[in-house]
């Protein structure tokens, strides 16, 4: 792979669709390899805009606007970092040879909503999943819940960071769940998934990398499993490695290899799985770095963003774990623009602790504004350090 010089005729140009905190780290990883990066998001001054060579603000669900921007910028690679994108336009762009979509336009199209990827995993590949039903109305949702049996989980087919997701323990809670799901949907606000609840011991993210081997063939590699805690579907903390039985780990890798192999292309995938003993169920997959994978900024020789950057460029990767670690989310706590952070010095005083403050221009009480990272002799010890550090950082309005 030949890499050029940014802002010159030889530039290797990559366009990121989505410039949040994950996209920002991908941009930094690409720039360290001499790549020219164009960051696109729906609002000004997104985290990735602040570090990219060029920034654009468009409605990425507008296929015509998206195609026009890609035609103007002429990137070698288009790298989606969010779900809310006009994926049909990406399919057309790939077919026309205007740019290569990472990992593939088909993979982005299938994973943009929960219906596409669930049907692929459960119905095409025959992978174990929770029982489920897709519904289009409140009446269908109630009927599906009765058929599956309470409790159930209700989600929009398209949302992120737990938005619109809730657990429903009985029929009396269904109306509130329906209203919340309708508000939480990002693009297709009229379709939902109802899932039966699995009795699992823990859930993991298995970061799975499809990258070129020395032979030129695509091979699949795995990072150490990441355990995580979610509240209402939103990541709160993660740690690596998550202890698993050898049988469960082997099965998790088989499932991850099957689904990412079917999606194809190059890059890093975040495969979410439920585990009980030696039994593993597929949950979801994202064809991009995963929020729970931010722990790898502290734990791995190459973090998930560096792995993604290398893989999409056709470069060698190293998924090795360096030391145990954990991450804990720092929330906005207030609704305000241009907030400041107190307590940063106290948070960083503990050995093995680091912070990432994302630079989002506007805070909300439950918006993820940063993350505390920690390493220690064990994941449990690192979790304590990360949570303590996150608690010391206080967002304040100014």
From Swiss-Prot:
Disulfide linkage: none
Under Enzyme Commission nomenclature, its number is 6.3.1.21
Q: Which residues form the ATP-grasp domain?
A: 119-313
- The residues that hold N(1)-(5-phospho-beta-D-ribosyl)glycinamide are 21-22, 81, 291, 360, 367-368
Q: Which UniProt keywords apply?
A: ATP-binding, Ligase, Magnesium, Metal-binding, Nucleotide-binding, Purine biosynthesis
Q: What does the record give as its pathway?
A: Purine metabolism; IMP biosynthesis via de novo pathway; N(2)-formyl-N(1)-(5-phospho-D-ribosyl)glycinamide from N(1)-(5-phospho-D-ribosyl)glycinamide (formate route): step 1/1
GO BP terms: namely: 'de novo' IMP biosynthetic process
For this UniProt entry, the molecular function terms from Gene Ontology, in alphabetical order, are: ATP binding; magnesium ion binding; phosphoribosylglycinamide formyltransferase 2 activity; phosphoribosylglycinamide formyltransferase activity
Q: Please give the SUPFAM superfamilies that the UniProt record associates with this protein.
A: Glutathione synthetase ATP-binding domain-like, PreATP-grasp domain, Rudiment single hybrid motif
Give binding positions for Mg(2+): 272, 284
Give the catalytic activity. N(1)-(5-phospho-beta-D-ribosyl)glycinamide + formate + ATP = N(2)-formyl-N(1)-(5-phospho-beta-D-ribosyl)glycinamide + ADP + phosphate + H(+)
One Pfam family this chain carries? PurT_C
Positions annotated to bind ATP: 114, 155, 160-165, 195-198, 203
Q: Gene3D superfamilies recorded for this chain?
A: 3.40.50.20, ATP-grasp fold, A domain (3.30.1490.20), ATP-grasp fold, B domain (3.30.470.20)
PANTHER family referenced in this protein's UniProt entry, alphabetically: FORMATE-DEPENDENT PHOSPHORIBOSYLGLYCINAMIDE FORMYLTRANSFERASE
On subunit structure and binding partners, the annotation says:
Homodimer.
Function text: Involved in the de novo purine biosynthesis. Catalyzes the transfer of formate to 5-phospho-ribosyl-glycinamide (GAR), producing 5-phospho-ribosyl-N-formylglycinamide (FGAR). Formate is provided by PurU via hydrolysis of 10-formyl-tetrahydrofolate.
In which family does this protein belong, per the annotation?
A: Belongs to the PurK/PurT family.
The protein in question is named Formate-dependent phosphoribosylglycinamide formyltransferase
Origin organism is Thiobacillus denitrificans (strain ATCC 25259 / T1)
